[in-house]
């Protein structure tokens, strides 16, 4: 038994994996296990995982058939031994005191969820500092902050969760933007959320993972997720309902931007998105 299980899905990240794992193993908080989930990676990522496991007893490795990010996270959740769960994407890296900060806040505030801030990292660009807050909030207050999206994001990776939050919840397999599908259900399981938005997580936007020349129909699942969330949040009060609706509008804007960038405006869904925005936002 350990305090924290850190789950790292691994797939085709050979150039980035060592930096990621090294940043986790260098944490100032030391009572943790790292679960590296090799999701059928065709490169040497799986071998690198095994190498770390042979050198550090805190590292465990799962080798599985490729099933996608949600499937890999779920596999890690299923075997986690920690009282708390954290997630790190295998092409990202973290500050050495990230889990110390998250753990101290979740324990001190007797919270169900602890959140820190994220640096968005782009090749050749300096990470930008974002507004910071430090407060403990109710689930409703936390939901509003996440719906507004200017300080707290929906990402799974900059958070520390009580393990019980996932007792009957898993990430939706086969879905794009999986974090958006589960965030409302996660917050509904919380009573208190500790927020310290100091930026401790480096979210790397890989050029080879974002193809600006093509558009995938999976992008429409971002809209689907927030429409589902909007429906879940009906009857929660005017502020929540308005924020949820704004989030659906934002999802439509984001997908439309990707369609235009990819010069795929002939898609039949484009007219639907434009019609929605004209009737709900413009």
What is the meaning of each model-derived region?
Residues 64-80:
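Glycine-rich, basic loop-to-helix element that forms the pyrophosphate-binding segment
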Residues 31-40, 60-65, 90:
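Short beta-strand/loop segment that forms part of the nucleotide-sugar
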Residues 5-8, 35-36, 63, 188:
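Short hydrophobic beta-strand elements that form part
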Residues 23, 38-48:
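A conserved acidic beta->alpha catalytic loop
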Residues 69, 90-194, 204, 208-217:
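Donor-binding/catalytic cores of nucleotide-activated saccharide
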Residues 205-282:
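C-terminal subregions of glycosyltransferases and related glycan-biosynthesis enzymes
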Residues 85:
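Short aromatic/hydrophobic "clamp" motif used to bind/position activated sugar donors
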Residues 1-25:
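N-proximal low-complexity "stem/linker" segments adjacent to membrane-targeting elements
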């Amino acid at each position: 038994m350990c305090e924290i299980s850190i789950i790292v899905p691994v797939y085709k990240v050979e150039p980035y994996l060592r930096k990621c794992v090294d940043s986790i193993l260098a944490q100032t908080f030391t009572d943790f296990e790292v679960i590296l989930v090799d999701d059928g990676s065709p490169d040497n990522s799986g071998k690198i995982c095994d190498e770390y496991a042979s050198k550090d007893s805190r590292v465990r490795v799962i080798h599985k058939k490729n099933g996608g990010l949600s499937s890999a996270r779920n596999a890690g959740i299923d075997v986690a031994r920690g009282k708390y769960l954290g997630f790190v994407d295998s092409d990202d890296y973290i500050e050495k005191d990230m889990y110390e900060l998250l753990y101290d806040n979740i324990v001190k505030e007797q919270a169900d969820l602890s959140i820190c801030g994220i640096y968005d990292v782009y090749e050749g660009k300096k990470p930008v500092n974002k507004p910071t807050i430090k407060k403990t909030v109710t689930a409703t207050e936390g939901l509003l902050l996440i719906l507004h999206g200017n300080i707290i994001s929906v990402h799974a990776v900059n958070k520390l969760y009580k393990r019980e939050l996932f007792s009957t919840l898993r990430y939706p397999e086969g879905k794009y933007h999986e974090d958006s599908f589960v965030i409302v259900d996660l917050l509904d399981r919380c009573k208190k959320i500790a927020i310290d938005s100091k930026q401790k997580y480096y979210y790397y936007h890989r050029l080879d993972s974002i193809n600006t020349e093509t558009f995938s129909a999976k992008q429409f699942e971002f809209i689907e997720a927030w429409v589902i969330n909007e429906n879940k949040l009906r009857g929660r009060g005017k502020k929540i309902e308005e924020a949820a609706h704004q989030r659906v509008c934002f999802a439509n804007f984001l997908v439309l931007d990707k369609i235009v960038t990819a010069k795929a405006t002939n898609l039949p869904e484009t007219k639907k998105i434009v019609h929605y925005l004209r009737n709900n936002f413009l």
